[in-house]
Amino acid sequence: MSALNLTRTDASVASTSKSEHVEAADARSYVIRTYGCQMNEHDSERIAGLLESDGLVRAESEDDADVVVLNTCCIRENADNKLYGNLGHLKSWKAKKDGRQIVVSGCLAQKDRDTVAERAGHGGGGMGAPHGPRAAAQHEAARTSDTPITEILEAAVVDDHAMFPSALPARRETSYDAWVTIQIGCDNSCAFCIVPAVRGEEMSRPYGDIVDEVHQLASQGVTEVTLLGQNVNSYGRDLQLAARRAGDDTAKLRPLFADLLRDVGAVDGIRRVRFTSPHPKDMRPETFAAMAETPSVCEHLHYPLQSGSDE
């Protein structure tokens, strides 16, 4: 099995059918356990897509799997205890069959990299939050090595737009709705949130890539999309600042997220548009206007009100 070429931008979104799994009964299989937020859920879809592109098939349970991926969260209560408890359980699971592997991905793997590497030592691999897209290459390296493989960044940085979660193949759980990543990282420093430390600075995905993906999703029968980011209503700020620093005086600051809502909502076949999560300090009248004037944008806000606390 060769390592997957991760420089491609194949944004395939079709769910793999159960019959395809049956036909590939002799292939190595995987299970993914996901903890935490919608970003992690979408990351897991992409990890699954990459693993299947590399020849693995989805197993119905851990008992049937050769590879278990634990995609972790470090925000939810007792997340670390759940992870380390699972690693303890999986130690006996791994011993029952030669060639089994455990890969730890996500925010907790980034935050507690040394501890995770030590606890997952019997398992085979560990990836930080930015390295979910390297799941297939990580799996191959761990499979052919006698020692644990870890690939956890000192700083959470993704500098290639081709490595955005939504720019990679996915195995989606449903055929009618889809996550669409528009941004990763966050430039805020809220006392209650550790996300900037594990997912890095804000980085907006190119506008055209997002709209193109939504068109592709609609052509495949998706009717509902959720735009994902740590602070979606600051989307595009970094793109425009970069253009202005490069001498483009026409790159005026404008409400790019409001524009994005309108353009995504106008895609033929898309009936519902949601987004999460906005930040109160970056919510602008233009965004509310776009919500009111775009029928497909749902009348719903997921608001982190604790960010307004002065305690």
Tell where the protein language model's regions lie, with residue ranges:
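Conserved SAM/AdoMet-binding glycine-rich loop
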Residues: 99-103, 111, 219-311
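Proteins enriched for Cys/Gly/acidic motifs involved in redox and nucleic-acid/cofactor modification
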Residues: 1-236, 256, 301
